[in-house]
Amino acid sequence: MQRVATLLALLGCLISCGDNNSAEPAIPVMSGSLAGAPAETIWRSQCVACHGSSGEGNRALGAPALTQLSAEYISRQLTHFVSGVRGAHPDDAAGKRMALSVAHLTADDIAVLARYLTTELPGTRPTVTLKGNATRGQDYYSNLCSACHGGDAKGNDLLGAPALAGVSDWYLLSSYQGFLDGLRGQHPDDNYGAQMARLAPALPDSNDVNDVIAYIATLPPRRP
């Protein structure tokens, strides 16, 4: 019976992790039988198909790398997906799929899964996929981003600012666009997201965003 539940969860993740451009994506709900299972079981059954066995991410499936984020940030985002803080906007198809794919996670599940991701899986460094002027990007980053995300882009949990170094560059771009477009940071309980949404327009155009991301890609991640 457990094997059947695992296979169903794997199938669900394969369907749910598509990109935002899918016309009418099927949206499965996480199998309730996985709630309360060991972190590795949840990870391998529900997450690996999209995020990769090492948490390295998969651009084709819209799944970012995860292992350079802090356990605190991962826990908060998973909690937001479960509670409806994230994935609630009608135009956020990817967020909606993610929210439903983890719908049955409990607070304990989230805590052990976040710990597993950040301690048991190897730190990965995604492949660079975007082009930009890292020198220009450094100026923008130092003036606009470093106060919260740190001069080394390794984040600051006290400020709710995630690590950026070591995160998939295409996902950084997608997330930034989400804040600009109002897909993220609009829920009344998303305090940190609201801060980011207010600050996002500070970068004038997409070239500037790419330059900042190009600079971030030159920085060493939190975990080697």
Where in this protein do the model-derived segments appear?
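Short loop/beta submotifs within extracellular cysteine-rich repeat domains
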Residues: 6, 49, 55-58, 73-75, ...
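The feature marks the first
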Residues: 27, 33-40, 44-83
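Bacterial signal peptide processing site
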Residues: 17-21
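General marker for long, soluble alpha-helical cores
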Residues: 25-28, 32-33, 37, 43, ...
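Axial heme c-ligation environment in periplasmic c-type cytochrome domains
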Residues: 58-65, 81-110, 127, 131, ...
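Sec-dependent signal peptide recognition
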Residues: 2-8
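Sequence/structural segment immediately N-terminal to covalent heme-attachment motifs in c-type
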Residues: 31-54, 129-154
